[in-house]
């Protein structure tokens, strides 16, 4: 997983609250067997409307989504995070996230930054008044900068550490590779063993 320290990109004002995972990516797209290529599925129902924010320039090139409260509610769906990342988003700002979405985001390298709703409102106005405005999300200082607006954001220390180090679940496991190898070397031969992956 790529490390996240600081990202600057076009901000996208999504004035919508209670955006659930089925709105982020409808269930029909969950039949795919790969982890990539979901950008066409992101907000697919809403993108049929020509006035939707991602159908407008320069917002269609955005990488920082500024959403309303209660983003990512509904079912646990890693595909929702994959779709956001495949489209090009690196961070989502909201005053409240569903816990399961926040957890999935941190494991996949998408920053879910919890920003006070008053600051979200100010950022929305800035982005709407000056489309194409860049938003900088700095994970080290836990701040968001948009024009003259500087706002703090909240994120738990563990998720912040994982993002700064670029550690997904596999990366975390591989930090203990030497211990795992040493344990398996002493494990009785009649017990199951982990075999190396075959590369073809």
Swiss-Prot record:
InterPro entries: 3-IsopropMal_deHydase_ssu, Aconitase/3IPM_dehydase_swvl, AconitaseA/IPMdHydase_ssu_swvl, IPMI_Swivel, LeuD. One of its GO terms (molecular function) is 3-isopropylmalate dehydratase activity. Its EC number is 4.2.1.33. It is an enzyme of class 4 (lyase). Pathway: Amino-acid biosynthesis; L-leucine biosynthesis; L-leucine from 3-methyl-2-oxobutanoate: step 2/4. It comes from the Bacteria. The keyword Cytoplasm does not apply. It catalyses: (2R,3S)-3-isopropylmalate = (2S)-2-isopropylmalate. Belongs to the LeuD family. LeuD type 1 subfamily. Catalyzes the isomerization between 2-isopropylmalate and 3-isopropylmalate, via the formation of 2-isopropylmaleate. PANTHER family: 3-ISOPROPYLMALATE DEHYDRATASE SMALL SUBUNIT (PTHR43345:SF5), 3-ISOPROPYLMALATE DEHYDRATASE SMALL SUBUNIT 2-RELATED-RELATED (PTHR43345). Heterodimer of LeuC and LeuD. This is 3-isopropylmalate dehydratase small subunit. It comes from Pseudarthrobacter chlorophenolicus (strain ATCC 700700 / DSM 12829 / CIP 107037 / JCM 12360 / KCTC 9906 / NCIMB 13794 / A6) (Arthrobacter chlorophenolicus).
């Amino acid at each position: 997983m790529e490390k996240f320290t600081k990202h600057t990109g076009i901000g996208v004002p999504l004035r919508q609250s209670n955006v659930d995972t089925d709105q982020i990516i409808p269930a029909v797209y969950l039949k795919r067997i790969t982890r990539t290529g979901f950008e066409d599925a992101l907000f697919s129902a809403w993108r049929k409307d020509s006035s939707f924010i991602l159908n407008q320039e320069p917002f269609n090139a955005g990488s920082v989504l500024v959403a309303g409260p209660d983003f990512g509610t509904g079912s646990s769906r890693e595909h929702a995070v994959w779709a956001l990342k495949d489209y090009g988003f690196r961070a989502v700002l909201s005053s409240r996230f569903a816990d399961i979405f926040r957890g999935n985001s941190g494991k996949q390298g998408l920053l879910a930054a919890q920003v006070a709703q008053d600051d979200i409102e100010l950022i929305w106005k800035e982005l709407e008044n000056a489309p194409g405005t860049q938003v900088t999300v700095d994970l080290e200082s836990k701040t968001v900068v948009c024009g003259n607006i500087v706002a703090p954001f909240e994120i738990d220390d563990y998720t912040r550490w994982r993002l700064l180090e670029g550690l997904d679940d596999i990366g975390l496991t591989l930090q203990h590779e030497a211990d795992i190898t040493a344990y398996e070397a002493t494990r009785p031969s009649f017990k199951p063993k982990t075999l190396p992956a075959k590369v073809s």
